[in-house]
Amino acid sequence: MQQSTPYLSFRGIGKTFPGVKALTDISFDCYAGQVHALMGENGAGKSTLLKILSGNYAPTTGSVVINGQEMSFSDTTAALNAGVAIIYQELHLVPEMTVAENIYLGQLPHKGGIVNRSLLNYEAGLQLKHLGMDIDPDTPLKYLSIGQWQMVEIAKALARNAKIIAFDEPTSSLSAREIDNLFRVIRELRKEGRVILYVSHRMEEIFALSDAITVFKDGRYVKTFTDMQQVDHDALVQAMVGRDIGDIYGWQPRSYGEERLRLDAVKAPGVRTPISLAVRSGEIVGLFGLVGAGRSELMKGLFGGTQITAGQVYIDQQPIDIRKPSHAIAAGMMLCPEDRKAEGIIPVHSVRDNINISARRKHVLGGCVINNGWEENNADQHIRSLNIKTPGAEQLIMNLSGGNQQKAILGRWLSEEMKVILLDEPTRGIDVGAKHEIYNVIYALAAQGVAVLFASSDLPEVLGVADRIVVMREGEIAGELLHEQADERQALSLAMPKVSQAVA
């Protein structure tokens, strides 16, 4: 039951940077003992608001009220000492220090200038035990997993007696088990009466955790949902982007050309039975299946990331021998991989380099000198045409959002002579607005005659974008559905593992 008095209130918050109005008149309330989700597209203002709350930024207008008192923090340390902690996606810890030292950094117990390590480890151990973590406080942080690092960040907040804890995309680098543990801890913190702010693009997380959801759009407050029994995915999407869910996908019937890609009894590691399918020029075929269905494994095999062990791949009726990615690229088949950060981009290189890295071999001068003029023009062209949001082509790609990283990968392949594109989870970790832009790029590629084969575990996405849906189950094709006839019940029925009829 919602309390009558909010513990945290934002009152008319505005924030202006030179030439940019990031927030305008943001007002809403948060209550103790609740998880309050913040949702919106990239650039909607969520992170800016958290930075105001944590003392990184001062508001241009408005105020933050905590437990009835108007607060103003000069920096993050002042906010933390006042009980406000932000757990960012990029964790702010020191790998070479111990767990205990990280938890009490800035307030190490000491006497006469000498740290009392016995007391330090004891106090840190209590915080870790509070979180259900069996970790030696004297362990150097660098030996722990990312999920354990996150628990140390939370312990650090609890050591300051934080009453307000905000999580900014906390699950982006976690395993399924670590996510379950994080959710357990968040629910415990809620029971203790803390205010939990939670920022995520993942709808399933929002619905699993939240007691209330506030939506932002273009730096403005849109709506707060407080009755979680009455809110659904479609209502959230409409609030976030200002259009109906059907408009997000934007599928239209189209005509197709000749067969462009054909798999004839193809097998690869993780693909249990031979796979045969065809994709025509201008056709979008979606691969859907549950975890372990073999979608990603098939994609990797087709691109040469793993070895095809049987069967034949044809492009434009010509057999293609694919033993490594360069063979696939030479044949006109490109891949946007599932793990974008590990396999799709070179994080410490620029947007320009990431776009040009594949095609630059065709444009070198004298066989060995990079053609800077071509590279600048090519990168700028794709940044404009794909609406890649970046300060410039020389910006490190790791500083871009997931959606803009994905568009840069697409720009890379648009620089090649593309016949087939393989898209493996192309919108995972991307906000709704950026998804819409990715879908439009997919449609544009199809209109140019490219054969599109895309794998996704997001069933509404597959049903909304694909002309034809191929359902995989346990490494084999379980069935096909046409766009106009497909629904979630049919697709899930095909995707579910078979139940043995044997009687013990």
Swiss-Prot record:
It comes from the Bacteria. Residues 8-243, 256-499 form the ABC transporter domain. Its EC number is 7.5.2.12. GO terms for molecular function: ABC-type L-arabinose transporter activity; ATP binding; ATP hydrolysis activity. It is an enzyme of class 7 (translocase). It catalyses: L-arabinose(out) + ATP + H2O = L-arabinose(in) + ADP + phosphate + H(+). Keywords: ATP-binding, Cell inner membrane, Cell membrane, Membrane, Nucleotide-binding, Repeat, Sugar transport, Translocase, Transport. Part of the ABC transporter complex AraFGH involved in arabinose import. Responsible for energy coupling to the transport system. The complex is composed of two ATP-binding proteins (AraG), two transmembrane proteins (AraH) and a solute-binding protein (AraF). NCBIfam families: PRK11288.1. This is Arabinose import ATP-binding protein AraG. The gene is araG.
